[in-house]
């Protein structure tokens, strides 16, 4: 009996190792292709297949306070956006022709980015994600879509990109004051334990930074399937002097609310499980004269 159990455990371990080896080989292949795509324009005849999510396994959440050895610019002026949006880079002036205007904080597998891209063809959208494998998946997904739609004049996904970053620590390193018009916080980590609430993506301290990078009239979009987290985010945003909640009527008419309702992987899962979703949107108010 003992030998049978030992053999079963060894077989299970062997299968797990083989599966991990296949995932690693797949990711290495995509990484090599990703590096090649960054060096060339998308004018070849090959068809890039969309990446397979099962090869990019990752924990559901990541500790934002950990040292993730992230690369980030010293200031927005030193950030090189050309490799993220090559079609928006003017090689003669060596400057970008447009700035990032819409940010998806904790973009997950990129569903919202990809659905928003055709709605804002003249604006640059950026997804920020802290998890390594998930970021690589979104990057591979965008590269594949750019290849598939390279002959389209519009809706060719050149206006979206993703970077691995920690928005809770380094957001002002990437964006100038009043640069963004929209920020999305879709199904963030709820951090249920009270001692973990400081790690939530909406806090008084972080709202000051969001107010800094948002332009006057800019919108913060939030959606979650956790009512307690929804109440937490609403409470902190309503208490902050630089934000004002938008009405339910406004939410019903806004196309971004409709898109984010069911475009993310988490949102689709909640729908499949017939769960509830809570939405709240807030407008960035003008800065008082005595604060400028």
Curated annotation (Swiss-Prot):
Keyword Repeat appears in the UniProt entry: no
HAMAP family recorded: tRNA_methyltr_TrmB_euk
Task performed by this protein: Catalyzes the formation of N(7)-methylguanine at position 46 (m7G46) in tRNA.
Similarity field: Belongs to the class I-like SAM-binding methyltransferase superfamily. TrmB family.
Active site: 189
Protein localization: Nucleus
Keyword Ribosomal protein annotated: no
Superkingdom, natural source: Eukaryota
Annotated EC: 2.1.1.33
MF GO annotations: tRNA (guanine(46)-N7)-methyltransferase activity; tRNA binding
Name this protein carries in UniProt: tRNA (guanine-N(7)-)-methyltransferase
Stretch list, region Disordered: 1-52
Keyword list, A-Z: Methyltransferase, Nucleus, RNA-binding, S-adenosyl-L-methionine, Transferase, tRNA processing, tRNA-binding
Species of the source: Debaryomyces hansenii (strain ATCC 36239 / CBS 767 / BCRC 21394 / JCM 1990 / NBRC 0083 / IGC 2968)
Disulfide-bond pairs as recorded: none
Classification via InterPro entries: SAM-dependent_MTases_sf, Trm8_euk, tRNA_(Gua-N-7)_MeTrfase_Trmb
Pfam family, one: Methyltransf_4
One GO cellular component term noted in the UniProt record for this chain: tRNA (m7G46) methyltransferase complex
């Amino acid at each position: 009996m003992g030998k049978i159990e030992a053999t079963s455990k060894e077989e299970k371990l062997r299968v797990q190792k083989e599966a991990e080896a296949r995932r690693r080989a797949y990711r290495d292949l995509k990484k090599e292709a990703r590096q090649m795509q960054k060096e060339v324009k998308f004018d070849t005849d090959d068809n890039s297949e969309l990446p397979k999510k099962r090869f990019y396994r990752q924990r559901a959440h990541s500790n934002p306070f950990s040292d993730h050895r992230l690369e980030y610019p010293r200031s927005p002026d030193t950030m090189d956006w050309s490799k993220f949006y090559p079609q928006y880079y003017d090689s003669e002036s060596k400057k970008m022709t447009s700035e990032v205007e819409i940010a998806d904080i904790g973009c997950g597998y990129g569903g919202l980015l990809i659905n928003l891209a055709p709605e804002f063809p003249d604006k640059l959208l950026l997804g920020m994600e802290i998890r390594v494998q998930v970021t690589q998946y979104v990057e591979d997904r965008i590269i594949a879509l750019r290849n598939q739609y390279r002959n389209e004049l519009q809706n060719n996904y050149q206006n979206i990109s993703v970077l691995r970053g920690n928005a809770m620590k380094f957001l002002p390193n990437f964006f100038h004051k009043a640069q963004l018009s929209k920020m999305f916080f879709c199904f963030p980590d709820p951090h249920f334990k009270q001692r973990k609430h400081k790690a939530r993506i909406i806090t008084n301290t972080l709202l000051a930074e969001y107010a800094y990078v948002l332009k006057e009239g800019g919108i913060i979009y939030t959606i979650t399937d956790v009512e307690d987290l929804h109440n937490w985010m609403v409470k902190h945003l309503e208490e902050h002097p630089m934000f004002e909640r938008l009405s339910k009527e406004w939410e019903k008419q806004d196309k971004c609310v409709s898109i984010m309702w069911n475009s993310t992987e988490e949102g689709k899962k909640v729908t499949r499980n017939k769960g509830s979703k809570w939405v709240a949107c807030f407008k960035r108010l003008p800065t008082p004269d005595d604060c400028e």
